[in-house]
């Protein structure tokens, strides 16, 4: 009897607990599960999964970019983007607390053979002036600076967001120095909702964008990498090399499409809840 009461008490406590470890600790809604149950599927490695094709086309159109590819994780989309943009012995410029540097298992070195130039930013954000100062001169003794990567929102910056004017200035620096510009947009929709921006605002400024379908949006798994057609064609090859080619993946792709179509605006509710918690603490 004592054991049963202890089990009941533990179950009750768990039912009253809110898990704040991550915005990925979610469960699909009944409506999302219904979409998953009825998802049309095919072989995505052969480009024949209609649900994945719909997701990729929808996302590319949303951002005003030419093409997109679905991957299992944001780490994979980031690493594929870096691999596509660089050659071994080149250099990637990013903020010191960036996810691509802190949380992707040394993937830049392992997958792309590149070194990293770290910038000490302000809550995860860097400026055009800092990027300019970080670019290596054309010197055979130096690694060639090839790619700048931004993160918006910045995870270890406490969810800080870039202003569009600041991104435009960084874009100009990249153009002037022939560098590509990648966006780790795992939580980009939080920034879009908070700042009342549009996805196409970002699509016009970056060579590649990675977005996550689970962080804040409630899909069980998956990320999308966006870019030009030739870039995404190359990305599909690296996705296969990294083990990211899936077969009947429309089951999870359908959940991701549902999340994009129904769950973005409700991020404003999350933001209000976060403000209430911050004020209470």
Enumerate the predicted regions with their spans.
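Conserved PLP-enzyme active-site core in the AAT-like
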Residues: 16-39, 43-281
């Amino acid at each position: 009897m004592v054991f049963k009461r202890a089990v009941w008490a533990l179950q009750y406590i768990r039912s009253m607990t809110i898990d704040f470890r991550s915005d990925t600790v979610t469960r699909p809604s009944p409506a999302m599960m219904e979409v998953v149950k009825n998802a049309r599927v095919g072989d995505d490695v052969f480009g024949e999964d209609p649900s994945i094709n719909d997701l990729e086309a929808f996302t590319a159109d949303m951002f005003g970019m030419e093409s997109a590819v679905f991957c299992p994780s944001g780490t994979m989309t980031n690493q594929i983007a870096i691999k596509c943009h660089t050659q071994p012995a080149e250099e990637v410029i990013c903020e010191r607390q960036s996810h691509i540097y802190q949380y992707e298992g040394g993937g830049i070195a392992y997958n792309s053979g590149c070194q990293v130039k770290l910038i000490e930013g302000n809550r995860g954000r860097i400026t055009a002036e800092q990027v300019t100062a970080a670019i290596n001169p054309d010197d055979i003794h130096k690694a060639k600076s090839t790619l700048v990567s931004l993160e918006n929102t910045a995870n270890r910056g406490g969810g800080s967001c870039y202003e569009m004017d600041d991104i435009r200035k960084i874009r100009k620096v990249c153009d002037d120095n022939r560098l590509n510009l990648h966006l780790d947009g795992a939580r980009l929709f939080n920034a879009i909702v908070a700042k009342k921006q549009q996805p196409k605002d970002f699509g016009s400024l970056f060579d590649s964008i990675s977005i996550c379908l689970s962080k804040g949006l409630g899909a069980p798994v998956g990320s999308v990498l966006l870019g030009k057609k030739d870039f995404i064609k190359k990305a599909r090859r690296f996705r296969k090399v990294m083990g990211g080619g899936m077969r009947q993946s429309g089951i999870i792709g359908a959940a991701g499409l549902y999340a994009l179509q129904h769950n973005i605006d409700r991020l404003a509710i999350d933001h209000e809840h976060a403000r209430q918690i911050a004020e209470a603490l």
